[in-house]
Amino acid sequence: MQNDDQNRSGLGLLRYIWTEWISTLVVLVLLLLTLIIGTGEMIHGQLLRMGERIYGDPATGMQYSFLRAEPTRPQCERNINVDQRVQQQIKADAADEYADFFGVRSEADVRAAVLQAQQVCEESYLFYDKAIQHVQAHPSIRAYRTFETSFFGIFKFGTENRALLLVIMVVFAAISATLKTHHIGLRSPSTRIDFKVYSVAMLVANAFLAFSSYSQYQSVLNSGVPMGEMKYIYWLWMILFSALTLISLYQVIKQPKPTREGGSFGLAFLSVPLYAYMAITTGINFTFFMDYPMGQGIYLGQLVEFSSIFLNLALFIWAGMLLKQTRVVDMFLNILRPWNLAPETLTWLILLAAALPTAYTGASGIFVIAAGAIIYKEVWNAGGRRQFALAATAMSGSLGVVLRPCLLIVVVASLNKEVTTDLLYHYGIYVFLLSSTLFLVISLFFAENKFRIAAPTVAAPQSGRAFIAIIPYIVIFILIWLFYKYALSTDLNEFTAPVMMPVILLMIVLFDKLRHEPAPLPAVGHWDETLTATLNSKSTPELATAGAAANAEYREAEHSEQPGKEMVVDHAVQRSKATEILRKVGFWKSMHISTSETVGHIGALVILMALSVSVGGLLERMEIMEAFPTDISSTILVISLIVGLMIFVGMIMDPFGAVILISATVAPVAYQYGIHPVHFWMITLIGFELGYVTPPVALNHLLARQSIGDAEVAEADAEVRHLSFYYRYERWILPVIVLLPAMLIIAYVPYVFKLFGWYP
């Protein structure tokens, strides 16, 4: 990513104003509006109930719902001459040209109708008089109903225009992500040749998308079908991709300043964002081979169709960036640090704990960005290999995809009536326990020191003090949960988590900043450099002595942003600078930082997901999924084909896009073969976990690199070049040898041993 502070004049100033202020402010307003939409129904229901309690009068039968609008005087005539009105109506009936066809009413029928109308009119006047008296007796009702109806108007507008809000958010976020070179790729561009290849690829990709959006608009326009509000969405797509094309064209002509010299043409292709590859691939196929240029634009419509899901994803991303502004992760690690655990054991505990925030941030990889750097630093400083620490960082954002309230499972349940969220979350716990246990077993197998722990007499008091320090944050969580539960009659679940988590984290950030909390405590240094206990692969594990633990050296990986460079890690003993910087950041500055980061991640992730759906659409139109055999008699063979297909799909597609494709194509075929729906989706979900950490996409590895920094990852790779194959590529191999056996166990064991009553 480029440093926005490098150039604050001319176009650089305009870019800075757009990315740091205009788009940040607009997206913040849209996120807050999304929060209002999400909580609007529950809040409005409470406002109506409160209005009834305050202004309702059971004695007179007056309800607040009658008074939400100013009472209007009835237009009917209150006092009439009944006989005269009856004669007038009889004459009018006689003059009716259809009277002979329907028959003429008798005088008694006409009189009854007139009397009934007079009674209704009198009741209207009585209600009007009673309502006016009630309003005059409660003058504050006008102010209250103005507030209540105004809130309802905002809520109603937002609910009816979710798709429009999402597309506007994506427009601002995607432009900012492009200006900041924030799109997700295998590595960031850094050399002159990197930027040249990057810019040309982005130009071609965005040009395809712009042309496809225009083709779709023209197709709908020529069809004569009324577009309604979709007209604005079509225009926004065309504006977005036209703007991105112009930005890419400018970057081709005037390339960003390289951050280092050298580079090669082949390696430069690693700098091209994944969404650009997807856009070019689908654009070429749809336009030139299928004569379907509007294909990409049509599949972008999936974002509109599932606008609620993607708005929730945006809220989860915001929650993750707010988490990054808190000390929660570091304070949790403070509880573990005194025990000086072996890196493998420490990592296992971190992964267990990380699964919950991963699920509560939508399983979108946002937790890796929010906490990846501190997890990496903690595992490495505990004595773990840097490659092992990188693997742990990537896996910290994948194990939670099967836990409540993961957004991915909500998408699965919404597209497949055969399963429910409760069923998937229930069996997801078994998947989580299996995969996390396998991680512990396999990582201990490759560990240099199998076991290490500090003396409980030393560690327990320190750990207890660290737990006491985190109690206020637990109290904040409980108070907000109780407020939603009892004040708004809403519990925390997979449907309300996207709305509640940003509110909880906003309060935690505010709490941190009001208390002027110091910087996070530094991580424990390498054990073998500081402690007297001799711990190596041949020794018997020992407890650390009190003196050794007391004299342990504490280090903080000082991450400094240097102009034009990625995050550089200096493992010197430096702590004061970070502390002072964190103390100077107030609440509003933290809000600005978190929202600005949210903008970039929304732009990068949502566009990637949209193009992933487009790739799924291409595969669907190529009828690749229809190649799945339909005459197989062996269930084991069917399961094997599903496993292979899920691994393939997980490797090349974002899970949110893959769910849409699989639900429409593979799932119905699997059900026909007798594969239990829950079993099928457990295989699919563990396949997505594997896909998160498996090349060529390996999204969590890319996000971990983004969090930790290219320079640090390069150093980690460089220091193991002389070692064996496994240790050279441990960050790629370890997640695979953990999750692949887990997937095979989940795929075959329930069928072979007839578990859970899924198979007769």
Model-derived regions: residue spans:
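Alpha-helical transmembrane segments of multi-pass membrane transport proteins
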Residues: Q2-P760
